[in-house]
From Swiss-Prot:
It is an enzyme of class 4 (lyase). The modification N6-carboxylysine is found at K191. Keywords: Calvin cycle, Carbon dioxide fixation, Chloroplast, Disulfide bond, Lyase, Magnesium, Metal-binding, Methylation, Monooxygenase, Oxidoreductase, Photorespiration, Photosynthesis, Plastid. The keyword Magnesium applies. This is Ribulose bisphosphate carboxylase large chain. The active site is at K165, H284. GO terms for molecular function: magnesium ion binding; monooxygenase activity; ribulose-bisphosphate carboxylase activity. The lineage of its organism: Eukaryota, Viridiplantae, Streptophyta, Embryophyta, Tracheophyta. SUPFAM superfamilies: RuBisCo, C-terminal domain (SSF51649), RuBisCO, large subunit, small (N-terminal) domain (SSF54966). RuBisCO catalyzes two reactions: the carboxylation of D-ribulose 1,5-bisphosphate, the primary event in carbon dioxide fixation, as well as the oxidative fragmentation of the pentose substrate in the photorespiration process. Both reactions occur simultaneously and in competition at the same active site. The gene is rbcL.
Length: 465
């Protein structure tokens, strides 16, 4: 029988409802909104085809390929509750389609061309199941949660951070001064803002030197190990590595990278360097909302979070649930646990579509940051637990008495919440009272409580289940 040219329906080849998924398959859950008149099976099959071996017409070289071995398969379709023309298409990809240890290649296939596909009005990748066989080809986070605690000698509480503001325009010397004041006041970390790279007002080398000086001075005075996330993100990979190497030569404990704008290839290289050289790696997710904010199109942040755990990072920003940026409680907690835990059961109420076994890939500390202040401390301590970093930028530097008292207020509030929790008190119910009690013996905290007593960022979340 000769080669049969022509166009045939995707569903004839790529829709296989009786397929049993393998332990080695990468599984994806897509939220599909087809164009009017396109049946769900055809749309789901089209997604499977276009993100694996298919093209729009039958080609001669199909005959010299083992399609059964390499094609993606749409194996299940379910309607989305409350949405008329939307459904979840589950697609299984054979492991052989992906290069080992490359998040870049995985995303190029799964979320590459298919998102521009005309037969679909919109497409969103809701979740991925990474099989053990694939996750074992990645190094993952440079160090992980336990190693970080051991390096910093800090146990039994969340870590405290602060992003130095104004984010742009400070000179290196003044920037270092702000870093020193915050660390001296009781914070564990300070942070470069994500867009501080190496601009005319502050070149990277000057910033690194002044921040290192600030950090060593604060360390000597407090007897605690301190860190400042030195942002190594740069225009080229070579320049990024140069900055990371300089940070290591200064002896600082941690560097930082913007993993979405910097790219997964650069991020994975940096993560490998960090593990080899004992640097912790803080990851900022600038640009994530471009990809994950729309409910119908793009990619959910939980997928970006899984990708980061593979690519490598010790901290990642994960929303606050209570501050100024997007994040619903159950959904946020779903991907927070997914970042920290070794094994995670499927749980649709938290947006988790697949059971994920990370087989001892190190965990990532979630970072809560964005519009939070001392009144949020009980809620944050309860929601995120000990394994997290709570970052107060304006909530430290906006203190009426200055940066160091702002840091003191946050540290006192945190220690009060941790102590109350350990005594068995209910942080959700008694939170305000716990903060008020602590403020009685901390004038710095009392002043902070007064400034921010009315501030709220109450808008409904865009991305609901």
């Amino acid at each position: 029988v000769g080669f049969k040219a022509g166009v045939k329906d995707y569903k004839l080849t790529y829709y296989t409802p009786d397929y049993e998924t393998k332990d080695t398959d990468i599984l994806a859950a897509f939220r599909v909104t087809p164009q009017p008149g396109v049946p769900p099976e055809e749309a789901g099959a089209a997604v499977a085809a276009e993100s694996s071996t298919g093209t729009w017409t039958t080609v001669w070289t199909d005959g010299v390929t083992s399609l059964d071995r390499y094609k993606g398969r749409c194996y299940h379709i379910e309607p989305v509750a409350g949405e008329e023309s939307q459904f979840i298409a589950y697609v299984a990809y054979p492991l052989d389609l992906f290069e080992e240890g490359s998040v870049t290649n995985m995303f190029t296939s799964i979320v590459g061309n298919v998102f521009g596909f005309k037969a679909l009005r919109a497409l969103r990748l809701e979740d991925l199941r990474i099989p053990t066989a694939y996750s074992k080809t990645f190094q993952g986070p440079p160090h992980g949660i336990q190693v970080e605690r051991d390096k910093l000698n800090k146990y039994g509480r969340p870590l405290l951070g602060c992003t130095i503001k104004p984010k742009l325009g400070l000179s290196a010397k003044n920037y270092g001064r702000a870093v020193y004041e915050c660390l001296r006041g009781g914070l564990d970390f300070t942070k470069d803002d994500e867009n501080v790279n190496s601009q005319p007002f502050m070149r990277w080398r000057d910033r690194f030197l002044f921040c290192a000086e600030a950090l060593y001075k604060a360390q000597a005075e407090t007897g605690e190990i301190k860190g400042h996330y030195l942002n190594a993100t740069a225009g080229t990979c070579e320049e990024m590595m140069k900055r990371a190497i300089f940070a290591r030569e200064l002896g600082v404990p941690i560097v930082m990278h913007d993993y979405l704008t910097g790219g997964f290839t650069a991020n994975t290289s940096l993560a490998h360097y960090c593990r080899d050289n004992g640097l912790l790696l803080h990851i900022h997710r600038a640009m994530h909302a471009v990809i994950d904010r729309q409910k119908n199109h793009g990619m959910h942040f939980r997928v970006l979070a899984k990708a980061l755990r593979l690519s490598g990072g010790d901290h990642i920003h994960a929303g606050t649930v209570v501050g100024k940026l997007e994040g619903e409680r159950d959904i946020t907690l779903g991907f927070v646990d997914l970042l920290r835990d070794d094994y995670f059961e499927k749980d649709r109420s938290r947006g988790i579509y697949f059971t994920q076994d990370w087989v001892s890939l190190p965990g990532v500390l979630p970072v809560a940051s964005g519009g939070i202040h001392v009144w949020h401390m009980p809620a944050l301590t309860e929601i995120f637990g000990d394994d997290s970093v709570l970052q107060f930028g304006g909530g430290t530097l906006g203190h009426p008495w200055g940066n160091a008292p702002g840091a003191v207020a946050n540290r006192v509030a945190l220690e009060a919440c941790v102590q109350a929790r350990n005594e068995g008190r209910d942080l959700a119910r008694e939170g305000n009272e716990i903060i008020r009690e602590a403020a009685k013996w901390s004038p710095e905290l009392a002043a902070a409580c007064e400034v921010w007593k009315e501030i709220k960022f109450e808008f409904p979340a865009m991305d609901t289940l």
